Design a protein with these regions (language model features):
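Bacterial Sec-dependent N-terminal signal peptides
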Residues: 1-28, 239-240
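Short glycine/proline- and aromatic-enriched beta-strand/turn motifs that initiate or cap beta-hairpins
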Residues: 23-76, 240
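Gram-negative (and chloroplast) outer-membrane scaffold detector with strong preference
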Residues: 31, 36-40, 48-54, 83-163, ...
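Residues that define the transmembrane beta-barrel architecture of outer-membrane proteins
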Residues: 38-40, 74-78, 126-132, 146, ...
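Flexible, solvent-exposed loop segments that connect beta-strands
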Residues: 56-71, 104-127, 161-178, 214-226
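Intrinsically disordered, glycine/charged-rich N-terminal periplasmic/extracytoplasmic linker segments
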Residues: 70-72, 78, 83-88
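Predominantly the C-terminal beta-signal and adjacent terminal strand-loop region
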Residues: 180-185, 190-240
């Protein structure tokens, strides 16, 4: 995993330079003139993400052992994916980008004791998701070697390590358990840059969970939360 992270960091650091070079050539000699006429094309994706939660605590936290505040901390991760693009028309494409998302999230429980002392109990939630998004891409007219676009669609995600975490959890440790299946709505914007030999794209995308992931158990950490839905910000670099 460490070697993979190093490789991805190198790619992510190199991607902005590719974007700069692509922008320099945006109004030069047109590249890949027949590219957009292809019915089907493929590529790959590397990306940076921030996993987070849309959390809804119980309205009255005072009954949960002096629990005062519940909030979340977003942590950085990365994405890998395979791009499959189907041309639906001059301005529309259908995109299927199966991949893996690696990331962590933290749920913070702030507890105040009778003596006034405060303690923040952090529950770290690590996830590796297999993502299956289906997106519609609406493209602007091509301006020499660049075009803008927006995407929208839905994604099914399966947490591959959720079952393993439940199985290996210590008997005396209280952990937040999540259901492994998630469905999300997605929306994003991006730019396509037509390089000499391939198309390079940069994309910003948000994903919002549609289902409550929290497994209800008889402990204050679980009972004090009404709803826990996923939220994900992603910067993607695609080579097609």
């Amino acid at each position: 995993m460490t070697k993979l992270r190093k490789i991805l960091i190198i790619i992510l650091l190199a991607a902005p330079f590719l974007s700069v070079n692509a922008q320099k050539n945006a109004f030069g000699v047109p590249n890949l003139l027949k590219y957009d006429k292809q019915l089907l094309h493929f590529g790959f994706l590397v990306g940076y993400n921030q996993f987070d939660f849309l959390i809804k605590p119980q309205s009255d936290l005072s009954k949960y052992d002096s629990l005062m505040v519940i909030n979340t901390t977003a942590l950085s991760g990365f994405n890998l994916g395979i791009v499959t693009n189907l041309r639906m028309g001059k301005y529309f494409d259908l995109r299927f980008i199966p991949g893996l998302s690696f990331g962590d999230r933290i749920v913070n429980y702030t507890i105040q004791y009778d003596n006034g002392e405060r303690l923040v109990n952090k529950k770290n939630i690590e996830s590796v998701y297999m993502d299956l998004p289906l997106l519609v891409k609406f493209k602007s007219s091509r301006m020499h070697n660049v075009r803008a676009y927006v995407v929208a669609g839905a994604q099914y995600s399966l947490d591959l390590i959720s079952a393993a975490k439940k199985k290996h959890a210590k008997t005396n440790e209280i952990v937040l358990k999540l259901y492994p299946n998630d469905f999300q709505a997605q929306v994003g914007v991006g730019f396509d840059f037509y390089c000499t030999y391939f198309k390079f794209s940069t994309e910003l995308k948000m994903s919002f969970g549609l289902v409550n992931l929290l497994v209800k158990e008889e402990n204050s950490f679980s009972e004090s939360v009404t709803s826990l839905k996923s939220k994900l910000f992603q910067i993607s670099f695609m080579f097609e």
